[in-house]
Amino acid sequence: MYAVVRTGGKQYKVSEGDFLKVEKLEGAVGDTIELKDILMVGGETVKIGTPLVPSASVVGKIVEQGKDKKILVFKSKKRKDSKKLRGHRQPRTVLKIEKING
């Protein structure tokens, strides 16, 4: 069984037992989170939401809270001595998908 989940403005296809890196979710390591924005549930029968499947949910456990790899943002002005170098690390949460209801 699989599901298409929407979280953090992105869509992910998940199955039970998968590890999923998503935008930061509130909670501590070991907490259980229930995701309600389910766009589609597949398996023997397929349920497609309009836009959401009303009775479906995905239960996951927070495995890790951390930051992604650093990305560098470099800006410069032509023919000037103006340069900026900035780094950014996006906060992220790693979930282990435990159960798909629906």
Swiss-Prot record:
SUBUNIT field: Part of the 50S ribosomal subunit. Contacts protein L20.
Native source species: Geobacter metallireducens (strain ATCC 53774 / DSM 7210 / GS-15)
One of the record's GO molecular function terms: rRNA binding
Membership in a protein family: Belongs to the bacterial ribosomal protein bL21 family.
PROSITE patterns per the UniProt record, alphabetical: RIBOSOMAL_L21
One BP term from GO: translation
Entry annotated with the keyword Heme: no
Pfam families in alphabetical order: Ribosomal_L21p
The protein's name in its UniProt record: Large ribosomal subunit protein bL21
Functional note: This protein binds to 23S rRNA in the presence of protein L20.
UniProt KW rRNA-binding keyword: yes
Origin organism lineage: Bacteria, Pseudomonadati, Thermodesulfobacteriota, Desulfuromonadia, Geobacterales
UniProt keyword annotations, A-Z: Ribonucleoprotein, Ribosomal protein, RNA-binding, rRNA-binding
SUPFAM superfamilies: L21p-like
Cellular component, GO, one term: cytoplasm
